[in-house]
Amino acid sequence: VNAGAFEVIRARIGLLIPSVNVVMETDFRRYLPPGLQAHAHRVYRRSLQSTHESENQVLADSLEAAKALAHTRADVIVFGCTAATILEGAGGDRIIGQRLTDATGIPTVTTATAVVEALRHLNARRVAMLTPYRDEINETEREFLQASGFEVTQATGMQILESLRIPQVGPGQIYRFVRDELKEPCDAVFISCTNFRAWEALPYLEADLGVPVVTSNQASCWAALRLLGESCPVRGGGRLFEEPA
């Protein structure tokens, strides 16, 4: 048997995601360097609408779901839901991550924390935020980013209420939406939502807009790799992965 035919698994990343999410694990498996695996576990979401109520329910049920995910013996966990992990405000995202770490014994980062760390890593101060969401969630995300030290130049959403519609928006549509709706000068563009195919559009947006673009899944992947101490290049990872630590 040729041992070289077997992939050596260096580390596992556990993804804790809402039950409606079909994009995050696909993105991780597409972009993770060889030797790293992603394993997802879903938090059942009783409502198929993207509202504060539905995100609060995901947050409330995340602890028990994380304990199940821990059975994969993941080396790190990502709580992959932007809208849920901002709900406790600036700094609350880290508290959420710590609660999950304490419950599982596995280092955990939330998408909200990953986004803040990514924007700071890029030295972004003025951030344009574009999302699939309605304004109810957009305003909460704006407040979170502003309280985290950023000037949010705009918070523009596609006004999608039904969660199952969000992953149906293709990367070409996302590219055109961001390009057409970006109004004010900014240091970076943040495209929110882990169930949104924004990472696929990222290289084209960075090339055309001339500023770094951060997406929820890209930032989450970057933060997970940092937790693992991995410095492997990520093809298609964008400016975030190119900036030295």
Feature map (PLM): residue ranges:
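Short, well-structured alpha-helical segments in soluble
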Residues: 59-72, 173-186
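N-terminal glycine-rich anion-binding loop in soluble enzyme alpha/beta folds
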Residues: 1-64, 135-170
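Conserved beta-alpha
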Residues: 96-161, 241-242
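Hydrophobic alpha-helical
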Residues: 175-208, 221
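Hydrophobic alpha-helical segments within soluble ligand-binding/sensing domains
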Residues: 61-63, 106-123, 219-230
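Periplasmic-binding protein-like
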Residues: 75-80, 128-130, 186-193
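Glycine/small-residue-rich loop that forms an oxyanion/phosphate-binding "nest" at active or ligand-binding sites
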Residues: 65-111
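Short, flexible loop segments at boundaries between secondary-structure elements
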Residues: 160-165, 209-233
